């Protein structure tokens, strides 16, 4: 498996989006504070801290595990870097430094790699894979709530400043990029999996995730206008169901019990917004049930709004928002069907094997026990 120049450029673009997302979030939080909207400022800052703290915890845990596996002692400087929220930046530094040598210093077109070159490419792919997992964590823990908050503020006031529009656009870009980057890293890091080749499969997968996410987020925003307590109760209930589902599947991503517990909590949170295969098993039935419930929940929220329209909500917005919710949901389901019916790399497999145990394992990788697709 080779780490190409295209992969290196994707890593560079990834850190640009990461830094931009971080700067915009801080900018929005400070702007809310100066405008006297202290609750919105605190929420925006809390979402950002929640995502980055969880990412730092997993990053440091993986650093310790890798050092232990290599027979080295854990270094206190890594702990300090993660306490200062620099763990992801440290990983980007190592990944880009080694990735540059793998992509540009060696001839990637040479088929006869020496052992040193193979080890370098394997090392870089593993580092980039770790980053894609951390970015996926942080994006869904911070980006999804942040996007809901910004959409709520936009619809409540009927207008927004440039920073809020920037936050919405950057959040969408971050969610989109981390989702596709994760899918590419998933298949590149596991040699027994087929690669996601071509632009069409990636775009189709992106639209499937993005449209279903956007539809659900707008539905949640409408429910927040109806009743904040009901909306929060629904989200907490779905979070609890996701955690129970993770425990029922007995995920085994972390060697440490406490980190595995945190992982299942995070998985439950991600399942509020989108579906992922948390154990690498056949997901046709669970995915179908998930999106049937999603469709019913979305239609239920829209029905309540049509039956009991709110006077505090601008009626001029409701019709276009309702149309947007329905269209994005339908498009998301359509792209889901197209992706799994035409573009999924495993669709033409002769035998259906368990994603984890059905095929011979060529090498160990954290991604093997992480969220599938």
Curated annotation (Swiss-Prot):
rRNA-binding as UniProt keyword: no
The keyword Amino-acid biosynthesis is annotated on this UniProt entry: no
Record keywords, A-Z: Apoptosis, Cell membrane, Membrane, Transmembrane, Transmembrane helix
Alphabetical list of InterPro entries matching this protein: XK-rel, XK-related_scramblase
Modulation of this protein's activity: Activated upon caspase cleavage to generate the XK-related protein 9, processed form. Does not act prior the onset of apoptosis.
Listed name of the protein: XK-related protein 9
Source organism phylogeny: Eukaryota, Metazoa, Chordata, Craniata, Vertebrata
Membrane topology summary: Multi-pass membrane protein
Family: Belongs to the XK family.
Transmembrane segment boundaries: 8-28, 38-58, 166-186, 203-223, 224-244, 256-276, 295-315, 318-338
Sites annotated Cleavage: 357-358
Gene Ontology terms describing biological process: apoptotic process
Cellular compartments annotated: Cell membrane
GO cellular component, one term: plasma membrane
